[in-house]
């Protein structure tokens, strides 16, 4: 179909789903430099320590590491620079109200290509306690044991 855009996931932040309880997700564009887009397409991005904050009505992404390509030479970008996320004004106002609640934060979940655009799935999240993490591990192990028993 002509209007349908393909979605190719480039980076997945699996650690975020373990460390945080995701309440809502938002899709946001990123304001990037040309060398950053090329590096992301080459799979040189890392979301592990990244987080987002709202500052003066803009959503900014911190600590997302995009390693520069060796071919960039003198045009190489700063790998850890702060990047602006592109969201609708309504979404930013909604997020501002929610982030001010105690214990909620913005965590990047996935970095993907939609057509030729690099986009990011942003999650409104609450940190999990240690016992919640242990409970998730137990559920995952019991599910794996059940599937293993069903295959026999």
From Swiss-Prot:
<dbReference type="InterPro" id="IPR020081">
    <property type="entry name" value="SsrA-bd_prot_CS"/>
</dbReference>
<dbReference type="InterPro" id="IPR000037">
    <property type="entry name" value="SsrA-bd_prot"/>
</dbReference>
<dbReference type="GO" id="GO:0005829">
    <property type="term" value="C:cytosol"/>
</dbReference>
<keyword id="KW-0694">RNA-binding</keyword>
<dbReference type="GO" id="GO:0003723">
    <property type="term" value="F:RNA binding"/>
</dbReference>
<keyword id="KW-0963">Cytoplasm</keyword>
<comment type="similarity">
    <text>Belongs to the SmpB family.</text>
</comment>
<dbReference type="GO" id="GO:0070929">
    <property type="term" value="P:trans-translation"/>
</dbReference>
<dbReference type="Pfam" id="PF01668">
    <property type="entry name" value="SmpB"/>
</dbReference>
<dbReference type="InterPro" id="IPR023620">
    <property type="entry name" value="SmpB"/>
</dbReference>
<comment type="function">
    <text>Required for rescue of stalled ribosomes mediated by trans-translation. Binds to transfer-messenger RNA (tmRNA), required for stable association of tmRNA with ribosomes. tmRNA and SmpB together mimic tRNA shape, replacing the anticodon stem-loop with SmpB. tmRNA is encoded by the ssrA gene; the 2 termini fold to resemble tRNA(Ala) and it encodes a 'tag peptide', a short internal open reading frame. During trans-translation Ala-aminoacylated tmRNA acts like a tRNA, entering the A-site of stalled ribosomes, displacing the stalled mRNA.</text>
</comment>
<protein>
    <recommendedName>
        <fullName>SsrA-binding protein</fullName>
    </recommendedName>
</protein>
